[in-house]
Regions:
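Entry/capping segment at the start of metal-dependent catalytic domains
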Residues: 1-19
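Acidic, Mg2+-coordinating catalytic module of metal-dependent nucleases/exonucleases
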Residues: 95-180, 184, 189
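Conserved DEDDh/DEDDy metal-dependent 3′-5′ exonuclease domain
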Residues: 25-96, 100-102, 106-127
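Helicase motor core with emphasis on the C-terminal RecA-like subdomain
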Residues: 233, 239-255, 267-271, 277-283, ...
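Interdomain "pre-motor" coupling segment immediately N-terminal to P-loop NTPase/helicase cores
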Residues: 191-245
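Structural motif
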Residues: 4, 47-50, 310, 386
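Short, glycine/acidic-enriched loop or turn micro-motifs at the edges of active sites
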Residues: 11-13, 55-56, 81, 393, ...
Length: 525
């Protein structure tokens, strides 16, 4: 190992004053003293200094000291940038603080320096394990950058620059990125972001998403990923786009179905899926039991596979959320969770962790959850690709009484877009089984007013062929009750009686019991 010394400075948050200094040489010789003069003596003629986030933290304090002493500044190696590149499956990249028994105990800069040194050794081994083409691609992108130049110099890695870096990337990531990606632009303008994006794609089958540190410091990484994997081209020779944006292939891959459901001969389900895949906002009126869940689940799962995108499904009923999640899990589709009041603290914490780490493509929540700071934090930290509003008729006049919090959805989406920079609108899909024109118009008006969204509409117009309707005219409550008893007695089968109030349900149930119906067969809610 070449001579290298890892340094860590402890600085007060309020006054930005250095209160402790630690360092460790590559031969494990430590330094621990709050003295820059003695630190410079310890660093005398060291060709490299390293640290964890040294570029954005420690170096701003060290550089003036080198200049003041007239010393040449050693080359810099930052293990934080390397960790995010070489261990992309990790969500967090901060140094562990397992030596601290108490949270308020000061950090030990010597221990942190040693941890950085040990991490650097792991990073060298990780780079060695990469295939030769990926090594050359990383070198071609990063050897001239402040973040990575010192690393390549330290390990004496200086291959000939690839003549066609774009072509090499396309060859190395064949069928994993679009062949029409603007690689030349990305190489020139966003080399670090492109390197991080390729690193993520290289481990794409892992459960984690884009590391939070990368998202914070290189927000363009998400945009780069979209250019590579989420912008369909029309080139028939692009194997990636032919598969990644093909709804029928996705249907077969995730749900094992060969074809979409039709409505009276119309391919509305397939058309709605295609619109969602293409990033359009849509309003779908499909009958209950008509396959509307798959219509929004499939594009969500496909987006999760492409760019670790998160689709947020807002549903008014906890039981409905649980049922849909359970059904997906039964089909071995595990990248979906719900966060609601039915979960115990352990289940809730686990669901939150999965959303945060990027292993979830579909999140079911209630409209009330949008007021939760935890939910807001989770969504800010993820690439939210779409909001799906189930039972969207709750926006209409009747829905305001049933679920007032539905009226906050538009405000929340606008707030989330602003927190993410406001440059990209998040598409919305609304699903309902209610085909009344005034209800549909209420939904359209709401989203146009709140988010300037114009929906592409898919209306089945189908009726439930397994349901038959009949209307009876009665003059009073006694006549209504008598007719109800006759219907129940004439049909030896389970029945559901709907009334407008819980109290009325209890009264009807009690009266039926008193009139000779078995107690155990009658329930009211």
């Amino acid at each position: 190992m070449k001579d290298i010394t890892f340094v860590d400075l402890e600085v007060t948050l309020n006054t930005c004053r250095v209160v402790d200094i630690g360092a460790v040489r590559s031969d494990r010789t430590p330094f621990h003293e709050n003295s820059f003069d003695n630190l410079l003596l310890f660093l005398h003629q060291v060709p490299y200094i390293g640290g964890h986030n040294i570029l954005k933290h420690d170096l701003s304090y060290l550089k003036p000291q080198f200049e003041k002493a007239g010393c040449r500044q050693p080359k810099i190696i930052d293990t934080l940038y390397l960790s995010s590149l070489l261990f992309p499956e990790k969500l967090h990249h901060q140094l562990s603080k397992d030596d601290k028994l108490q949270a308020d105990k000061p950090n030990n800069p010597v221990n942190d320096s040693l941890k950085s040194l040990l991490l650097f050794e792991e990073e060298q081994n990780a780079f060695e394990r990469l295939d030769s083409m990926l090594k050359m691609i990383y070198y071609g992108l990063l050897h001239d950058t402040d973040e990575f130049g010192g690393f390549f110099d330290y390990i004496d890695y200086a291959p000939d620059i690839l003549d066609d870096l774009s072509g090499s990337i396309l060859k190395r990531f064949d069928k994993e990125i679009c062949i029409s990606s603007p690689l030349a632009e990305l190489i020139t303008s966003y080399p670090v972001e492109l390197a991080y994006g390729l690193s993520l794609i290289n481990c794409w089958n892992s459960s984690s998403g884009i590391p939070l540190w990368v998202l914070h410091n290189y927000p363009k990484v998400g945009w780069v990923m979209e250019r590579l994997r989420d912008t369909p081209c029309e080139n028939n020779e692009c194997a990636y786009c032919r598969g990644a944006f093909n709804g029928k292939e996705g249907l077969k891959y995730f749900f094992k179905y060969d074809s979409f459901r039709t409505y009276e001969g119309e391919d509305l389900q397939q058309k709605a899926v295609k619109a969602a895949i293409e990033g359009e906002s849509l309003l779908a009126v499909f009958p209950t039991g008509g396959g509307k869940s798959i219509t929004f689940q499939l594009p969500a799962l496909m987006s999760g596979k492409r760019i670790k995108g998160l689709t947020v499904v807002i549903s008014p009923l906890q039981s409905l959320m649980k049922d849909q999640v359970d059904n997906l899990w039964k089909n071995e589709i595990m990248d979906v969770v719900t966060i609601n009041g039915m979960l115990d603290p352990v289940e809730r914490a686990h669901a939150i962790q999965r959303v945060e780490e990027g292993s979830v493509s579909i999140l079911y929540i209630s409209p009330e959850s949008l007021r939760s700071k935890t939910i807001e934090r989770l969504l800010v930290g993820r690439k939210v690709v779409r909001f799906v509003i189930d039972e969207a008729h709750c926006f209409s006049a009747w829905g305001q009484d049933f679920r007032v919090d539905y009226l906050y959805i538009g405000d929340f989406i606008r707030l989330l877009q602003e927190q993410k920079g406001g440059k990209q609108a998040i598409p919305v899909s609304c699903f309902t089984a209610t085909a009344k024109q005034n209800v549909i118009q209420d939904i359209k008006d709401y989203f146009f007013e709140k988010l300037n969204i114009r929906f592409k509409t898919f209306c089945s117009g189908s009726t439930r062929k397994n349901l038959k309707y009949k209307v009876f005219k009665v003059e009073n409550e006694d006549e209504k009750y008598g007719l109800l008893r006759s219907i129940i007695e004439d049909h030896d089968c389970p029945a559901i009686v709907y009334v407008s109030r819980t109290r009325t349900a209890a009264k009807v149930a009690t009266r039926l019991q008193q009139d000779g119906n078995p107690d155990e067969n009658i329930q009211s809610e």
